[in-house]
Amino acid sequence: MARFTDRQLELLQAYVDKTVAAFGSAGLVFSVESDLAAWADTMRSAPSITAVSPSFDPEHSWLTPANSFWVCLRDGSGNVVGCICSRLFETDDMMQVIRSYRLFFDRKPVLDLRPLRLVAPDDVPIMSGRVGYTGGYWLHPEWRGRGLSRLLPRINRALALRRFDLDWLFSLGRDTER
C-alpha cells in the first residue's frame, strides 16, 4: 500500500525542484549517487572530518543501490562541497538494530559490544517496517554559513521518503562542544 498520495508526491517533487534550483543559483551542481564507496572515499579526504560513518561505508555495511544513496553538491570545478546519505532498513524493531550495532556494522559481527546509550521516552512506538536512516552529513568549511546546512539534509530526507516509501525516518546525533 502506498504511503503517499499523488498530491503528497507532487509536493515532495516541487520541494526537490525548488531546492535543486536554489543550489544552481549558488553555483552548485546537485546529484544523487548510488556508489557509497565514493562517498566514503570523499569523506576520508574531506577537511574537518574526524571519522567516516560505518553505516554508509561499504567496508562495514551491506549497501546497494536498492537500499542506499547519497546526495552530493559540487562546485563549478567539480569538487564535492557537501553531501549526506540515506539508507533503508526493513525490520521488526529498529531499536534492536541500533542496540546490536547492525546499524553501524552489518557486514561483520561486533564481538566487543560497548554500552550504547539510547535516549528515547518509554512511550516511543516501535519503529518497524521500512525504516530510513540519514547521516554521514558533511559541508566543506568554506561553504558553511550560506544556508546549505538547512537545505541539504531536507532534500535528502525528501528523496529518501519518496525513493524508499518509508514508514519511519530518523537520524542520530551526538553532543559536541559547540
Predicted regions and their residues:
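Non-catalytic substrate-recognition and accessory regions of acyl/acetyltransferase enzymes
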Residues: 1-119
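Acyl-donor binding region in acyl/amide transferases
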Residues: 97-178
